[in-house]
Regions:
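Intrinsic disorder/low-complexity signature
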Residues: 3, 15, 55, 204-207
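Bacterial N-terminal signal peptides
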Residues: 2-12
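A general structural-boundary detector
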Residues: 4, 33, 56, 60, ...
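Alpha-helical cap/lid subdomain in secreted, periplasmic
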Residues: 18, 45-48, 70-211
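Serine-esterase "nucleophile elbow" of acetyl-processing enzymes
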Residues: 16-65, 72-81
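Intrinsically disordered, low-complexity regions enriched in Ser/Pro/Gly/Gln/His and often acidic
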Residues: 12, 35, 183-184
Length: 211
């Protein structure tokens, strides 16, 4: 009986080690495919690119703030046990003019909770329109850089780099990227995400190769 139990535990551990990594995306409308079909969003395109080599869970909600994300994250971590957490929040904080210190506190909670759950964190930064004033804008964008430095995180400085100022890639509201922009968003994320995947992928799936 002891031998059988030990064998079962060994097999369970081996299966877990071979399981593909699990990615949890916690974001707002930029990651929730707002205004387009879900299958067109960059998170869905990420799942397609990974092609079963990782499980992608999209817990993004349009309109979400960093405070809402921080409140939801503990349950998400417990439910999904992710290996990598992609944090894409702050845009709605900025558009509402919320204090950058509040954004930093909320993202800090999320980073620390993710790391306590042994997940790697990828921080996806965002910018806000210049009409909010340069001082506020600098303080806002600086939050992402400081947190990346403080917690030694990989950072995508601006998720919509090369997209936000191109009207052909934005919806009519000028805030949300359209379907044509989604592959470009994924291309902005991929260089920072790939090193984390390389660390968590089982040997049999590294470099895109299957046994």
């Amino acid at each position: 009986m002891v031998w059988t139990l030990g064998l079962l535990l060994l097999l369970a551990g081996t299966a877990g080690a071979d399981a593909p990594p699990r990615l949890l995306v916690v974001g707002d409308s930029l990651s929730a495919a707002y205004g387009i079909e879900a299958r067109q969003g960059w998170v869905a395109l990420l799942a397609q690119r990974l092609d079963g080599r990782a499980e992608v869970i999209n817990a993004s909600i349009s309109g979400e703030t960093s405070g809402g994300g921080a409140a939801r994250l503990p349950d998400l971590l417990g439910q999904h046990a992710p290996d990598i957490v992609l944090l894409e929040l702050g845009g709605n904080d900025g558009l509402r003019g919320l204090p950058p210190g509040q954004l930093r506190a909320n993202l800090t909670r999320m980073i620390e909770a993710s790391q306590a759950a042994t997940a790697e964190v990828l921080l996806l930064g965002i910018d806000i329109p210049p009409n909010y004033g340069q001082a506020y804008r600098d303080a806002f964008t600086g939050v992402f850089h400081r947190l990346a430095d403080d917690y030694d995180l990989l950072l995508v400085p601006f998720l919509l780099e090369g997209i936000a100022l191109d009207s052909e890639l934005m919806q009519s509201d000028g805030i949300h990227p359209n379907a044509a922009a989604q592959p470009l968003i994924l291309d902005n994320v991929w260089p920072a995400l790939e090193p984390l995947l390389s660390e968590t992928w089982p040997t049999r799936t590294r470099n895109g190769e299957h046994e």
